[in-house]
């Protein structure tokens, strides 16, 4: 559940789960499961996997969430990149999800990325679900030039639909 849809009680869960660790106020609720899972793995010889909306491995979530998991010496064992998940509910509540497994660092078994029905062995799976080193790109805090105003919301469709063009407007 995205941060804007969370109840007061759900927002309070973040301070309980994160404890003294700093966290972003815009994290999806599923972030708590990843933190709890990493905490558990760091104290045991366990592994887990979650299905989560793909927003968990995009944008600010990566810089706000995954450094906490890395400090617990937890790594990704396998990952399924984004795919559409539908159900039989009225109105078919389809969402785009990923599957992500976490395990203690140093396990000798292979790591795999599954994408489009293809399994690829990986040296390392980073939080962008790529076979690449663990890097975290932070959100820039200032415009790239003083000629541009600061961006308040980034990529957030909050214009009331006014930026949609019909075919005639597009051709014009």
Describe each region flagged by the PLM.
Residues 1-172:
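Signature of N6-adenine DNA methyltransferases within the class I
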């Amino acid at each position: 559940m995205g941060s804007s849809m969370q109840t007061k009680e759900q927002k309070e869960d973040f301070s309980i789960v994160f404890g003294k660790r700093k966290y972003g106020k815009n994290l999806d609720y599923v972030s708590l499961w990843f933190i709890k899972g990493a905490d558990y793995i760091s104290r045991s010889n366990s592994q887990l996997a979650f299905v989560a909306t793909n927003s968990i491995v995009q944008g600010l979530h990566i810089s706000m969430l995954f450094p906490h998991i890395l400090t617990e010496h937890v790594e990704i064992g396998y990952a399924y990149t984004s795919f559409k998940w539908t159900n039989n509910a009225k109105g078919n509540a389809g969402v785009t999800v990923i599957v992500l497994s976490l395990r203690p660092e140093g396990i000798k078994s292979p790591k795999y990325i599954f994408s489009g029905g293809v399994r690829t062995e990986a040296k390392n799976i980073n939080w962008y679900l790529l076979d690449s080193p663990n890097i975290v790109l932070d959100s820039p805090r200032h415009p790239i030039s003083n000629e541009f105003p600061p961006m308040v919301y980034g990529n957030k469709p909050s214009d009331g639909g006014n930026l949609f063009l019909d075919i005639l407007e597009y051709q014009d």
